[in-house]
Every structure is written in structure tokens, then in C-alpha cells.
Design a protein with these regions (language model features):
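Class I SAM-dependent methyltransferase SAM/SAH-binding core
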Residues: 37-39, 43-94
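Helix-to-beta-strand junctions that scaffold the AdoMet/dcAdoMet cofactor pocket
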Residues: 55, 113-114, 128-129
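Core SAM-dependent methyltransferase catalytic element
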Residues: 255-268
Length: 268
């Protein structure tokens, strides 16, 4: 067998995926020999770490709907950790042929279960063994509230009614800690834990704010989508970006949900 020389610790330079993975690992019962299904595996945080911990007697399968993310993860792997594999698969519609695992993890994953998150989570549990553990993380309701409030204020100054309604809908669509606890209870999970921890994101003002790699992709783009007129969107968002002081600190809520599948489940 090929001797493993590389270590697969969580990358310290990642200011988003790693902090969320840390709260996931804080709830995960992890030991050698486990089989793990890691959903929304992206480029491998924390799939590589999980594979290193379960060792060659275990199995880790990372799935992601993005072919480019799967290709990136495979390129990083480069033949290491042969008991780890990455596959392109929509976690909302997994084939019945996919087996059940002892652990089901997903870092920054809950948002990708939409539009019917509860039904999608119920489907995930078909691939968790009885007595197995589910641990998922996501940025919960309340994440970057100061940003949404400032954008709403600026929209109000411009007299924008439809755009404000769309923004409110975007914000309300994000699940809360109470929401996900309710899902786990309805799914008859046991030893449920739902924990939120703050994460401060640092940014400059102006274009540094508007193009911030953590803020733009999953958050500010939602605000831009509220506008039919993108020139107006740019004008409003530029005004917001120049008022960074009123929004700081920029706080995300790292939410981790965990629960154990009963050996004998009761459908509710």
C-alpha cells in the first residue's frame, strides 16, 4: 500500500469554509473505520481531513452538483487517500443505488437543499444508517444583518418598493436555527444539537466591499438580483459600500445542526 506522507489539515488561509468546518468537526463523532457521505463537498473542505481521520479502513464519498468543483477536488487529491472519492451528484436527488453511510456531513450545505429543504433532508436520511450521525453547517438567518439593513435603508431613500420587497424575501428565505431544529425533530432524530457561533468578516469600503470574495458570491449578488435595472443597482450598492462604518462589524452566523438517526425510526 502506498505510504501516506501528506497531511490534510483544514487550510488556515480559507476564511470561510474552514471556520464553518471547524464547528462541524466540533459536533462530529469521528473515528477510524467510519463510512462518511460528505454532501456539497466543493473542493474538499473538510472531505480530505475526514478521509485522513477515518483511515484506509474507512470510506469517504464527497458529492457535489458542480462538475468544476468535483474536478478541482480530484486535482487536489492526485491519487492520495484512495478510500476517498469525489462524484458529481445532486444531493437533492440521489440514486437509490447509493448505499447508506455511518456519517452524513455537509459543510456550507443547507442552502443547496432549496427550494424544498425539509423534503431534501428527509431524502438524505435514506442514505444514513440507523444509529448514524448527521452534521451539516450553513450561514443561518441573521447572517450579515447589518448589510441587509443598510441596503434596505438605501432602497428606501430611492423610493424603491418592489426591490425592497424582493430583498426582504431573500433575507427571510434563509433558514434559522429554530427552523432546522424543527426539521430534525420532525424527522425523529435524537441527540439533536443546533449551535450558532459568530464569525466576523473584515472588508474595506467601496469596490473592496462590493467585490469581496466572501460577500459578493453568496450574499451581495442576492441584493443585485432584486433590481431589474442593473445601473440603478450599481448606484444604490455603491452608496451602501461607501458607508462601511455603519455596517461593521460584519457578522456571519455559523450554524451547525447535528442529530442521530434512531435505530427504529417513526415516520412523522
Amino acid at each position: 500500500m502506498k505510504v501516506q506522507t501528506k497531511t490534510w489539515s483544514l487550510p488556515v488561509q480559507d476564511d470561510w469554509s474552514t471556520p464553518f468546518a471547524e464547528v462541524l468537526l466540533g459536533q462530529l463523532d469521528l473515528r477510524p473505520g467510519l463510512s462518511i457521505l460528505d454532501i456539497a463537498s466543493g473542493h474538499g473542505i473538510p472531505a480530505f481531513y475526514l478521509a485522513e481521520q477515518v483511515g484506509p479502513t474507512g470510506t469517504v464519498v464527497g458529492i457535489d452538483a458542480s462538475r468544476s468543483q468535483v474536478a478541482s477536488a480530484r486535482a487536489i487529491q492526485r491519487g492520495e487517500l484512495p478510500w476517498l472519492r469525489f462524484e458529481c451528484q445532486d444531493m437533492r436527488a440521489m440514486p437509490a443505488s447509493l448505499p447508506a453511510f455511518q456519517r452524513l456531513t455537509g459543510n456550507l450545505s443547507v442552502m443547496f437543499l432549496r427550494p424544498n429543504r425539509f423534503e431534501a433532508m428527509r431524502g438524505l436520511l435514506d442514505h444514513l444508517e440507523p444509529g448514524g450521525q448527521l452534521v451539516l453547517t450553513f450561514p443561518s438567518l441573521g447572517t450579515f444583518d447589518s448589510i441587509w439593513q443598510r441596503i434596505d435603508q438605501e432602497m428606501g431613500r430611492y423610493g424603491l418598493v418592489i426591490e425592497r420587497e424582493r430583498l426582504a424575501a431573500h433575507v427571510a428565505e434563509r433558514p434559522s436555527a429554530a427552523d432546522v431544529r424543527g426539521w430534525l425533530e420532525r424527522l425523529d432524530m435524537e441527540r439533536i444539537a443546533v449551535v450558532e457561533q459568530p464569525l466576523e468578516v473584515v472588508s474595506g469600503s467601496g469596490q473592496r466591499f462590493l467585490q469581496h470574495p466572501l460577500l459578493r458570491g453568496g450574499f451581495l449578488d442576492d441584493a443585485y438580483e432584486c433590481f431589474d435595472d442593473q445601473r440603478l443597482a450599481e448606484e444604490v450598492m455603491t452608496q451602501v459600500s461607501l458607508d462601511l462604518k455603519s455596517m461593521t462589524p460584519l457578522i456571519a452566523r455559523r450554524c451547525v445542526l447535528a442529530g442521530w438517526k434512531r435505530v427504529s425510526t417513526i415516520e412523522r
